[in-house]
A protein has these predicted regions:
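Cytosolic regulatory regions built on CNB/CRP/Popeye-like sensor folds
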Residues: 1-124
Length: 124
């Protein structure tokens, strides 16, 4: 994703909600600096799903899907984020497929993790 991460860079301050669950947009983010919390809210309670840091991606499903965001993401500290838009992703996918392999690996790893959690939930 080296080419993609040269795109737009944004700075967000601690506490900023970067992605809101239920919204739809068509970009993903790579964390250049800082940490974020990924969470969901159910019946007025917030559930922390994971924490992400430098080099990690979030929002990647919306590069290929028009579905609503499945979680919210909030800056745990001041962050610098690289924005990957759907047009940039599509251009890279066609011109330089190898450059999107790291992001595709993230997608498959998260799918594998969700499958394992689902199987464990079925067994309990």
């Amino acid at each position: 994703m080296r080419s993609a991460v040269r795109g737009k860079t944004i700075r967000v301050v601690k506490g900023t909600v970067i992605v809101k669950e239920g919204t739809t947009d068509t970009c993903a983010y790579q964390i250049a600096r800082g940490r974020v919390n990924v969470y969901t809210e159910r019946k007025g309670r917030r559930y922390l799903l994971t924490r992400l840091g430098p080099g990690q991606f979030f929002g990647e499903l919306n590069l290929i899907s028009d579905a609503a965001r499945s979680a919210s993401v909030q800056a745990e500290e001041d962050c610098v984020l690289r924005v990957i838009t759907r047009p940039v992703f599509n251009r890279l996918l066609h011109r330089s497929p190898k450059s999107v392999v790291p992001l595709i690996k993230v997608l498959f790893e998260r799918l594998r993790t969700m499958n394992l959690k689902y199987l464990l939930a079925l067994e309990s």
